[in-house]
């Protein structure tokens, strides 16, 4: 009995254990534990691909169509145009994102880029085999190639892909210069001129997909073979089937898909891999769709139909057609389902019934009826409507209305009476002036710039050449530490901001603008200062400082960071290589920047330079500079669009780059090659430019205008004539580096200051002392400053303590290497000409200044009657006297003049003799010790002394000497001749 009880107990215990074990194995608790383990294993084994989200967003933002035309008479001109446009569009997107294109099956036009050329068709035999290494700097670009490559292997590389491909939304139809049909899920594509291809279509109609990749490399392949032979692969497959998780497995690459419409049935597809994992770790097919080919065929016993559903703006549309037939029909999916339901419910179905139900023509209804008779299940693939290509935005101009009763805040002060009876004016701080600032400096220039802009395909190519020329090797740049930036920002306000924001990393990108406090020759739209968040500026400065020292200061045309002496040397060096020099003046430069210049040139340069480790951060910082919300000090909101934010770390260098690019592009438009155009850029400092005269004025202006800028040619100076750069006049840069500060602009404002805090006498001493450093030998300026200091109490000043002093004395290196000067009597002629006087009148006044002793308030003033034309209607107010108020004149095209230089520039072009030839300057025609009253101005002066005749400058046709323009034209002609010569 006891034995029986023991056996019973043992059997009961075993049964209990079995039942308990079974319940545990099938319990939700164990399932949760297994799933949790699986998730942890996946988290440990998956790999996130770097910068995927940023790359995808950048591609979406930068996708902008570039139109490329082909020659007339091309056998399939429209198709080739769209194809070439797509290729240039994709290349442009890649380079604007800071990456380099890797082109699979490039055409001869793309031979300069890295890529792979293999043989997929007969046309490929025109080129040689090549296979460059793919790096993490590349984005793969394909044009009508994805049909022939293993997309699973390509996506598995983990490199972003841009491809132009055929994505039909119907089962047959017309395409540009041809038509297509579908048989056995293969598209048969026929184009005029003989192109006839068959291939399958990849299904990109999911936003997130995956691919499986086979092992790559010798050892990985060998390991896989050994696992297959030993049965490990089969065992892992069994475990995966039973448990949903197993060792090993193929690599799975997950990626996002975006599509952009190029034309009918034609899309640009963006593929950005973002993670990898192993297939045996999860039931991957339950997570999403695997990249596969499109399936159009609907098999049945009667006839093989093709079907595809297209999601349009009006709703889903289904396309039906017999395999291989050109005839097809497309109708709303809902209508087709209703027709099919009616067909199935009706006992007798005739073609006439389908015609009536579908409300289609007999021809289209016949296709629908045939499909219904075949009894197709119609499990059609779905094709999604792609996104449209990005477009430019148009800025809306703000209107402003000056309130006569408004009393603006005055800030400018005089520390002495003006050297001239005419003085500069200052805009008061008021709401009406802020509205005028937005209209005249931002919204208006942006609207006019967009109306002028005309970007051609060649300009995209030239922009890429310029970027690569400035940054030959990509990905070498790294930012400086933020501590480096703080050490170089030594102004009191900068130090205070650094201290306050040192522990704050996050910020909201809002532009806070204010009206700049500065003097104008005549009433003008006040300049706008757009400040950006401190963190944005400091972080971006860490890149701009590094880029400036690594790249910019080593190129010959870049003048910032150079001392005045070095700049003067550069002007003289440029003159030595030129027979003519051209001065350029941009109007409202900051307000006329458009997206092409910012993204295709400026941003592309920084992105190409920076290392991939920092590309994401830099791209974000650069993106913040465009279309940021902005508000003025008095609360007026506005849209800066793509204009330059003047308080940004990019301002000086970005403006210099843009200025240089305009000069470079003009050279390319004139027929120069890359190196030649680069050599003839000239010199630039922000919006100030000076270049050789080998490009015509019309071409320079037209080139700038096509980019949106408003460029005026101020002076085309032949050898021996005065030239102005950075508001300094060089009497003859071909023979001397000496220069003087622009007399008119300086003398109108010399006696004023915008400093509202410092002692007025301290400011006066500091300002005059600063001008005596840079222009002690300049007639009138030097005389006036010495007269002021002679008649007031001497002071010891530190230039760093004052803001309203010349820029060129704020740096000790600049002071030690100041502008070269000379005591030539010819400078009297220059100053007199600038002020509209005779030399005798000027010398008389200078003698009065030298002899004056008395209170500063009694300093002699020179009477002038210059035409200082207002640029806007104003109510004159403030302590500083202003010019008259009048309506702005209009140009020939009816637009208001927009130049910032209010005073007329006198005789910046060469004088002419009776035959209309350019004449040399005074010094070569004058006897020693004699002065010429007519220095640069050909107009009649108040002096009764008649002008002396001058020998003409020999033109190209009258001597053996050729101008720079002749050399360029000759070089271009020789180049064309070489191209025409047989090899």
Curated annotation (Swiss-Prot):
Catalytic activity line of the entry: RNA(n) + a ribonucleoside 5'-triphosphate = RNA(n+1) + diphosphate
* Keywords attached to this entry: Nucleotide-binding, Nucleotidyltransferase, RNA-directed RNA polymerase, Transferase, Viral RNA replication
Any one GO molecular function term: RNA-directed RNA polymerase activity
This enzyme's EC code(s): 2.7.7.48
Checking InterPro entries in the record gives:
DNA/RNA_pol_sf, Noda_Vmethyltr_dom, RNA-dir_pol_C, RNA-dir_pol_PSvirus
Start and end residues of each RdRp catalytic domain: 579-701
Instruction: Please note every region of biased composition (Polar residues).
Output: 883-899
According to its UniProt record, this protein's enzyme class is transferase
The record's Gene Ontology biological-process terms are: DNA-templated transcription; viral RNA genome replication
Q: Give me the ranges of the annotated region Disordered.
A: 879-983
Q: What SUPFAM superfamilies does UniProt report for this protein, alphabetically?
A: DNA/RNA polymerases
Q: Where is the composition biased (Basic and acidic residues)?
A: 914-937
Compositionally biased tracts (Low complexity): 943-960
**Family per similarity comment:** Belongs to the nodaviridae RNA polymerase family.
Function statement? RNA-dependent RNA polymerase which replicates the viral genome composed of 2 RNA segments, RNA1 and RNA2.
The protein's name is RNA-directed RNA polymerase
């Amino acid at each position: 009995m006891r034995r029986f009880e023991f056996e019973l107990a043992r059997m009961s215990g075993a049964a209990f254990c079995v039942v308990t074990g079974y319940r545990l194995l099938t319990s939700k608790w164990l399932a949760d534990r297994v799933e949790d383990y699986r998730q942890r294993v996946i988290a440990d084994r998956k790999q996130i691909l770097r910068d995927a989200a940023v790359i995808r967003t950048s591609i979406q933002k930068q996708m902008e169509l570039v139109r490329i035309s082909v020659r007339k008479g091309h056998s399939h001109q429209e198709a080739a145009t769209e194809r070439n446009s797509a290729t240039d569009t994709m290349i442009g997107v890649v380079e604007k994102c800071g990456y380099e294109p890797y082109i699979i099956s490039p055409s001869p036009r793309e031979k300069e880029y890295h890529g792979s050329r293999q043989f997929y068709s007969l046309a490929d035999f025109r080129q040689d085999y090549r296979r460059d290494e793919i790096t993490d700097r590349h984005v793969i670009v394909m044009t009508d190639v994805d049909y022939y490559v293993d997309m699973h292997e390509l996506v598995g590389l983990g490199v972003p892909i841009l491809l132009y491909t055929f994505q039909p939304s119907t089962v047959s139809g017309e395409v540009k210069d041809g038509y297509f049909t579908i048989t056995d899920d293969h598209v048969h594509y026929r184009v005029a001129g003989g192109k006839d291809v068959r291939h399958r279509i990849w299904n990109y109609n999911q936003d997130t997909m995956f691919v499986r990749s086979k092992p790559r490399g010798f050892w990985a392949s060998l390991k896989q073979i050994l696992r297959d032979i030993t049965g490990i692969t089969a065992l892992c497959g069994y475990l995966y089937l039973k448990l949903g998780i197993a060792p090993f497995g193929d690599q799975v690459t997950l990626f996002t898909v975006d599509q952009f419409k190029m034309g009918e049935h034609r899309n640009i597809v963006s593929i950005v891999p973002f993670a990898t994992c192993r297939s045996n770790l999860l039931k991957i097919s339950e997570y999403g769709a695997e990249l596969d080919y499109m399936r159009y065929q609907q098999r049945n016993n009667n006839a093989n139909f093709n079907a595809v559903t297209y999601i349009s703006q009006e709703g889903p549309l289904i396309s039906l057609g017999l395999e291989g037939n050109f005839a097809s029909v497309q109708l709303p999916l809902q209508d087709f389902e209703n027709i099919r339901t009616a067909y199935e419910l009706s006992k007798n179905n005739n073609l006439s019934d389908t015609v009536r139900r579908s409300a289609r023509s007999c021809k289209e209804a016949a296709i629908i009826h045939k499909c219904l008779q075949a009894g197709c299940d119609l499990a059609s693939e779905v094709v999604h409507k792609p996104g449209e290509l990005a477009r430019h935005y148009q800025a809306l101009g703000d209107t402003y209305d000056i309130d006569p009763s408004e009393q603006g805040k005055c800030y400018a002060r005089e520390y002495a009476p003006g050297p001239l009876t005419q003085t500069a004016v200052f805009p008061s701080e008021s709401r009406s002036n802020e509205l005028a600032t937005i209209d005249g400096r931002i919204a208006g220039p942006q609207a006019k710039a967009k109306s002028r802009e005309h970007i051609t395909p060649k300009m995209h190519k030239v922009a890429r050449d310029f970027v690569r020329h400035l940054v030959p090797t990509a990905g070498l740049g790294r930012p400086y530490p933020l501590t480096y930036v703080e050490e170089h920002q030594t102004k009191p306000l900068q130090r205070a901001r650094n201290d306050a924001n040192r522990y704050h990393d996050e910020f909201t990108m809002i532009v806070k603008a204010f009206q700049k406090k500065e003097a104008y020759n005549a009433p003008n739209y006040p300049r706008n200062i757009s400040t950006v968040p401190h963190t944005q500026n400091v972080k971006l400065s860490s890149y701009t400082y590094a880029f400036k020292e690594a790249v910019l200061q080593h190129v010959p045309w870049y003048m910032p960071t150079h001392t005045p002496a070095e700049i003067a040397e550069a002007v003289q060096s440029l003159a030595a290589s030129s027979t003519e020099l051209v001065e350029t003046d941009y109007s409202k430069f900051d307000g006329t920047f458009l997206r092409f210049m910012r993204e295709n040139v400026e941003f592309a340069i920084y992105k190409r330079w920076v290392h991939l480790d920092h590309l994401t951060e830099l791209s974000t910082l650069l993106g913040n500079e465009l279309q940021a919300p902005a508000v003025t000090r008095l609360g007026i909101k506005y849209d800066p669009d793509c204009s330059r934010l003047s308080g940004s770390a990019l301002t000086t260098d970005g403006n210099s780059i843009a200025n240089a690019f305009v000069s470079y592009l003009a050279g390319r438009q004139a027929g120069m090659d890359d190196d030649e155009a680069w050599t003839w850029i000239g010199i630039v400092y922000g919006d100030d430019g000076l270049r050789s005269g080998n490009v015509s004025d019309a071409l320079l202006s037209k080139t700038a205008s096509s980019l949106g800028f408003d460029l005026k040619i101020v002076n085309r100076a032949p050898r021996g004539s005065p030239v102005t750069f950075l508001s300094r006049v060089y009497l003859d840069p071909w023979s001397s580096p000496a220069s003087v500060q622009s007399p008119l602009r300086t003398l109108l404002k010399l006696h004023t200051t915008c400093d509202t805090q410092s002692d007025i006498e301290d400011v006066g001493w500091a300002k005059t002392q600063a001008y005596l450093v840079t222009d002690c030998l300049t007639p009138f300026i030097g005389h006036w400053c010495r007269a002021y200091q002679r008649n007031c109490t001497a002071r010891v000043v530190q230039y760093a303590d004052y803001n309203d002093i010349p820029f060129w004395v704020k740096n000790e290196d600049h002071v030690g290497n100041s502008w070269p000067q000379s005591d030539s009597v010819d400078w009297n002629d220059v100053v007199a000409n600038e002020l509209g006087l005779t030399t005798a009148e000027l010398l008389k006044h200078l003698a009065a200044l030298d002899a004056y002793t008395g209170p500063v308030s009694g300093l002699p003033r020179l009477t002038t009657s210059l035409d200082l034309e207002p640029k806007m209607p104003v109510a004159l107010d403030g302590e500083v006297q202003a010019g008259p108020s009048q309506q702005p004149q209009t140009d020939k095209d009816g637009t208001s003049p927009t130049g910032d230089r209010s005073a007329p520039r006198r005789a910046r072009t060469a004088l002419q003799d009776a035959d209309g030839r350019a004449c040399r300057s005074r010094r070569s025609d004058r006897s020693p010790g004699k002065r010429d009253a007519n220095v640069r101005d050909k107009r009649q002066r108040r002096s009764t002394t008649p002008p002396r005749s001058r020998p003409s400058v020999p033109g190209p046709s009258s001597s053996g000497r050729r101008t720079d323009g002749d050399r360029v034209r000759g070089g271009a002609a020789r180049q064309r001749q070489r191209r025409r010569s047989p090899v």
